[in-house]
Regions:
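Short beta-strands within extracellular/lumenal beta-sheet-rich domains
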Residues: 53-81, 90-93, 122-126
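A short aromatic-anchored loop/beta-hairpin motif
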Residues: 43-51, 58
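Sec/Tat signal peptide C-region and signal peptidase I cleavage site
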Residues: 15-20
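Beta-strand signatures of extracellular beta-sandwich domains
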Residues: 94-98
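Residue-level recognition of well-ordered beta-strand positions that form the cores
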Residues: 83-85
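Terminal, low-complexity interaction segments
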Residues: 21-40, 51, 89, 99-141
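Sec-dependent N-terminal signal peptides
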Residues: 4-13
Length: 141
């Protein structure tokens, strides 16, 4: 009985310690991305742009045949969680997370926010995004 009580107490302490740690973490790894609409303060639009709208039904953020992914987000701070996995070869590679804008209906790569460490994949990375970032452009380094 004491063990059960102690385990319950430890679980509650763990929940309190970690509460709020990832309150605003956007995970594009294992979920469908809606074409529009709010999700924890984040708005998605044109997350994969490949010519005439190919690849728009992909799950998660995947780099298109042009080698990039783009989406819009609301002006709130948070974390972007990505899982890097190279499906074509075993070579390590990096990913650049940049500011992005739409100009003339096409995504444009802006200022570099972060470059991930070299990964062979699958490897999880988390990038902090501040409230001034309203468009994200992801590409291979």
């Amino acid at each position: 009985m004491r063990k059960l009580l102690l385990l319950s107490l430890l679980a509650m302490v763990s929940i309190f310690v970690h509460a709020g740690e990832n309150d605003l973490c956007w995970d594009y790894t294992n979920k469908d991305i809606p074409s529009a609409g709010p999700d924890n303060g984040l708005y998605y639009a044109g997350y994969v742009n490949d010519g005439e709208g190919k690849n728009l039904s992909l799950h998660g953020v995947k780099l298109n045949s042009s080698g990039y992914a783009y989406f819009k987000k609301a002006a709130v701070a948070g974390k972007l969680k990505l899982v890097i996995s190279n499906r074509k070869s075993t070579a390590e590679f990096k990913v650049d997370v940049c500011r992005g804008t739409m100009e003339g209906g096409k995504p444009v790569k802006g200022e570099l926010i972060a470059t991930t460490a070299a990964a062979q994949g699958p490897e999880e990375v988390v990038v902090d995004l501040d409230e001034t970032v309203t468009g994200v452009y992801i590409t291979r380094n």
